[in-house]
Amino acid sequence: MRMMRAIKQGQWAILLWPYLLTTSIPLDCRDEQGGLSRCPSISQEKLLDRVIQHAELIYRVSEESCSLFEEMFIPFPLQLQRNQAGYPCITKALPIPSSKSEIQQISDKWLLHSVLMLVQSWIEPLVYLQTTLNRYDGVPDMLLNKTKWVSDKLMSLEQGVAVLIKKMLDEGLMTTTYSEQGLFQDDGQPEMLEYVMRDYTLLSCFKKDAHKMEILLKLLKCRQNDIHSCA
């Protein structure tokens, strides 16, 4: 039954995948020399709209990836224990507001820098995830394609947010000084179940943070229109 649900989800994903690719507006800001010279020609309003659309798609595809991974590899009893597996989210230590009241109180500057911190913190872990998924027997191509797509789009999102910071705040690119040692440390040869739970936690945490990126960017957009009615 679980396998049939996963297959059906995969079929729907295959049907929707071309739509996602064709409706996604490009956000590649880098020129041939690697500089961020393309996006500055876009208006601030349009650039923010593109950044928000990218964040929405990243969250949607991360949600689909997490569900597909869960259906394929996680027995139901372990789904209930995923938060007790000893793998905290890698962005837990970042100084990013989490409650609704905290988010509403922070400045536009901190909204943008919070999004950038989240984006930068997940670029390497998603590359790492693509390598670990190759250990699995029978991993569907759809899952591999989705994680690769999200990884690529996350780097584009970083570029877009960096240009937004330059446009709105007249500041340079900030890099996150966050150590991922806990995620990438060598544990010898852990059991396959440990790999599975670690990757499941990684996907679940990224889905949560991708949603937070979307929320923060939409709040920023709302403030640009009418700061008094944003919730």
Curated annotation (Swiss-Prot):
It is found in: Secreted. GO terms for molecular function: growth hormone activity; growth hormone receptor binding. Pfam families: Hormone_1. Disulfide bonds join 29-39, 89-205, 222-230. One of its GO terms (cellular component) is extracellular space. Its main location: secreted. This is Somatolactin-2. Glycans are attached at residue 145. Belongs to the somatotropin/prolactin family. Gene3D superfamilies: 1.20.1250.10. Keywords: Disulfide bond, Glycoprotein, Hormone, Secreted, Signal. One of its GO terms (biological process) is positive regulation of growth. Residues 1-24 form the signal peptide. SUPFAM superfamilies: 4-helical cytokines (SSF47266). Pituitary gland. InterPro entries: 4_helix_cytokine-like_core, Somatotropin/Prolactin, Somatotropin_CS. It comes from Sparus aurata. The keyword Secreted applies.
